UniProtKB/Swiss-Prot annotation:
NAD(+) binds at G8, Y9, K10, G11, R12, M13, G95, T96, T97, A121, P122, N123, F124. Pathway: Amino-acid biosynthesis; L-lysine biosynthesis via DAP pathway; (S)-tetrahydrodipicolinate from L-aspartate: step 4/4. One of its GO terms (molecular function) is 4-hydroxy-tetrahydrodipicolinate reductase. It comes from the Bacteria. Coiled coil: none annotated. It is found in: Cytoplasm. It catalyses: (S)-2,3,4,5-tetrahydrodipicolinate + NAD(+) + H2O = (2S,4S)-4-hydroxy-2,3,4,5-tetrahydrodipicolinate + NADH + H(+); (S)-2,3,4,5-tetrahydrodipicolinate + NADP(+) + H2O = (2S,4S)-4-hydroxy-2,3,4,5-tetrahydrodipicolinate + NADPH + H(+). HAMAP family: DapB. This is 4-hydroxy-tetrahydrodipicolinate reductase. NCBIfam families: dapB. GO terms for biological process: diaminopimelate biosynthetic process; lysine biosynthetic process via diaminopimelate.
Amino acid sequence: MVKVIVAGYKGRMGSTAAQMVIDNPDFELVGVYDARSEEQNLGEDDRFKGQNVPAFHDLDQIKTDATVWIDFTIPTAVYENAKFALNHGISPVIGTTGMTDEQVAELQKLAKDKQVGGLIAPNFGISAVLLMQFAQQAAKYFPDVEIIEMHHDDKIDSPSGTAISTAKKIAEVRQPKEQGNPDATETLPGARGAEYEGMRIHAVRLPGLVAHEEVMFGGPGEGLTIRQDSFDRISFMTGVKVAVEKVNQYHELFVGLEHLL
């Protein structure tokens, strides 16, 4: 039985993760945390009536025997949350994006020092993991590429962690290249999107969307588009479940769900 605490349970991803833990007979939800809440018990939330699980709204309050910390909070909170988990011997499974490379490196060092496993996943959807792998393969042959990520309009950070991770994987194998006409101008600033290693990333925010990404490659006389769609947040729970099951087997902090698959 894996004992789990879920951080960010008031949000849509966090509440979905909490329900996944409750529904899984191999997991036990032993606590929830959300700095926005003043509830003392998860059962006070209308979505979780009948559940008797301690709820915390301050890290200093947390007393738990959890071995896994699922985090779907916000970019400004996730780093401190992950440090708290690692310092208490709890393996973090982090779906919150927005941390800097320096923060990730510090967490990886802390995990190694504490001999605690952990995972930071820009995306827990299996289709998104496959998209990144396929895009990396295609980039060996198509150095001209643009990334378009599309999310719901409540998403705070842009571009998405998945788009950045996709760009990093492409950059590992792509021939260095500055795309487009070197004399090109923008009538409206930002029209060509954000620049990363010579390629462009575009972020779309609209109501009705959940999480979607297209990677478009172009070559002489041909093109290739790889697309992934998450239509419901439940699609991410397969990856979260895998992470919860496996993360305690390791003694380091991985970045990317593919390391556990």
